[in-house]
Amino acid sequence: MAQHTVYFPDAFLTQMREAMPSTLSFDDFLAACQRPLRRSIRVNTLKISVADFLQLTASYGWTLTPIPWCEEGFWIERDDEDALPLGSTAEHLSGLFYIQEASSMLPVAALFADGNAPQRVMDVAAAPGSKTTQIAARMNNEGAILANEFSASRVKVLHANISRCGIRNVALTHFDGRVFGAALPEMFDAILLDAPCSGEGVVRKDPDALKNWSPESNQEIAATQRELIDSAFHALCPGGTLVYSTCTLNQEENEAVCRWLKETYPDAVEFLPLGDLFPGANKALTEEGFLHVFPQIYDCEGFFVARLRKTQAIPALPAPKYKVGNFPFSPVKDREAGQIRQAAAGVGLNWDENLRLWQRDKELWLFPVGIEALIGKVRFSRLGIKLAETHNKGYRWQHEAVIALASPDNMNAFELTPQEAEEWYRGRDVYPQAAPVADDVLVTFQHQPIGLAKRIGSRLKNSYPRELVRDGKLFTGNA
């Protein structure tokens, strides 16, 4: 694999020499940093099993190497890498996999280790969505996830990825993560804090990542991280699990932040060792039981992961002074909800008791029941999935609901050919050789729902959202 030139400040190299265990070679570290990062994907098991995915892609010339800490994760090498971006493959467009760096699969693996099965989870710094979607898959779309993102521009990307992956148990918020300890005390069974950091571990992906690096900036970032982990710890239920992670390598932003929390709450913080998380985890294990992943150990990004348990309650923070404002939605009455459910089932949309119908004007939404306890305590950017808009003739079903709720085995499902599916993703109407009978048609490809179409004569009217329409080459040559 080709080398690329990484910029290393001298002070950074000195810091790494001091931080690196004697069992590791500094020369190996430098060599690993100069190699481009291996690409990796995670199969979205909400849509397809790993076995079925491997069978589906077997003829594509993809070499998939299992990632030890994630059963759904694979390093990928492709024959058609230059001809077709991985994000333009049919399997990516329909949400069958997520392009995710291997190291970033570690925090969620730690969150669910040892049979941990949380019902209400917070992802404090969630965009672009790799870990939120991984959490949702581990929860099998049940329970509830609060996915927060401080950057306004990244909230839209977060929602797009959640929607593409067919996730329905998520509420989105847009706050500084330091507010949650006061706003939502002891509300979560598990919390992932993948903290903003100096990014020292990402030089294989971005050779200039350290251009603005300095020891002083590390100290400033670590101060923010301490405030974030303190807030997250307050939002965690007693007995709950907190995973703290970064994509950086210095100890000040990693081990020292976790030690600070334990020193602050000595009777409430327990470090849960990660040496048994996967075969070979001991190669990255610190004396506290954290994983400090230098890039040469597993040939991936540099990363840090710690798992903590809150063993008892801690004194509450002062209640926030802000007002949330009126919640603009109201629950749909049972009788009307039954009619809506029946109409939705007619086009192949079904949901379980984990979701409840709410209404705002002519909009119908499905909210995860597990998030209802947070209503009135925090303002949401987006909650659950938009099911439909009502109009005189019935319902206008929404694309995100089709992706999240539709069964490809519905009687009105219509499987497109590769050529027809390509037209669909380009936003064009489809003219199948044998038109379906139903007026409302659930459009599928590779036995996966990709949209809802109106049949007009022999034409299927395209309803694919304009912002998702693709140009250029689509699909593998074998699709």
UniProtKB/Swiss-Prot annotation:
Binding site for S-adenosyl-L-methionine: A125, A126, A127, P128, G129, S130, K131, E149, D176, D194
Any one annotated GO CC term: cytoplasm
Catalytic reaction annotation: cytidine(1407) in 16S rRNA + S-adenosyl-L-methionine = 5-methylcytidine(1407) in 16S rRNA + S-adenosyl-L-homocysteine + H(+)
Cellular compartment(s): Cytoplasm
Pfam families: Methyltr_RsmB-F, Methyltr_RsmF_N, Methyltranf_PUA, YebU_pre-PUA_dom
EC number: 2.1.1.178
Coiled coil: none
List of catalytic residues: C247
Alphabetized UniProt keyword annotations: Cytoplasm, Methyltransferase, RNA-binding, rRNA processing, S-adenosyl-L-methionine, Transferase
Keyword Ribosomal protein: no
GO biological process: rRNA base methylation
Annotated GO MF terms: RNA binding; rRNA (cytosine-C5-)-methyltransferase activity
Function in brief: Specifically methylates the cytosine at position 1407 (m5C1407) of 16S rRNA.
Designated name of the protein: Ribosomal RNA small subunit methyltransferase F
